[in-house]
Amino acid sequence: MEYPNDESLRVSHETIYRSLFIQARGALKQELVRHLRSKRRIRRSRHSSVHGHSRGQIVDAISIRERPAEVADRAIPGHWEGDLLRGARNSHVATLVERHSRFCMRVKVPGKDTATVVAALSQHVRQLPATLRRSLTWDRGLEMAQHKRFTMATDVQVYFCDPQSPWQRGSNENTNGLLRQYLPKNVDLSTFSQSELDAIALRLNQRPRQTLGFQTPASKLQASVASTP
């Protein structure tokens, strides 16, 4: 150690591990694996679930506690929060909110099963530029049980909230409240087309928000993307 007496210049083993795995997008290169005692190429979260879906758990779920610090401070665009909004007759719409700008997207989902939800979300997220595909924070709903498939399709890492902790997706919860003006709980959401959902999202994205200094989410996101190298 070059600076043994200066704690500000020290890093923990966890920091080193996380840096290596983030650079390799969760999977280490083979030459690095040879130096690990576990010989494990893909790292399993200490907070992840190893139980099967029969117990209501998500296999290898990565905890919100392991998100990069840049997600929390909202300084960098491309980090999203997501959820399923429920309507009448067991209908649902997937909602996505970008944390930096509060820009939202609404995605039509024919069913709540994980294969259907992941396929619909993947199709929409893949259309975003790479600078807007950094992470997604979701709750513990089994609709994201196939989160690994979503990550493979979009290159977006999924992080899961603690159980019964909706405040950990505050932007999404707040925007869902605004969305209820257009999609009330007693309405069958399956009757809305994707074009109609896009039109509703456009209204919200063009509405000035106090939390953004009365900028609109659309203009905030556009400016952020333009300034991101």
Q: What are the functions of these language-model segments?
A:
Residues 1-50:
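Conserved short alpha-helical interface segments
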Residues 16, 83, 96, 102, ...:
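Mobile genetic element proteins and their domesticated derivatives, centered on retroelements
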Residues 37-94:
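Mobile-element integrase/transposase regions
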Residues 86-89, 106-130:
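Active-site beta-loop-alpha junctions of metal-dependent nucleic acid enzymes
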Residues 93, 160-161, 206:
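Polytopic alpha-helical membrane proteins, predominantly small-molecule transporters/carriers
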Residues 102-107, 160, 185:
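Short small-residue beta-strand/loop micro-motif enriched in glycine and branched aliphatics
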Residues 138-154, 159-183, 190-202:
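RNase H-like two-metal-ion nuclease catalytic core shared by retroviral integrases
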Residues 185-229:
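C-terminal domain-tail junction helix/linker
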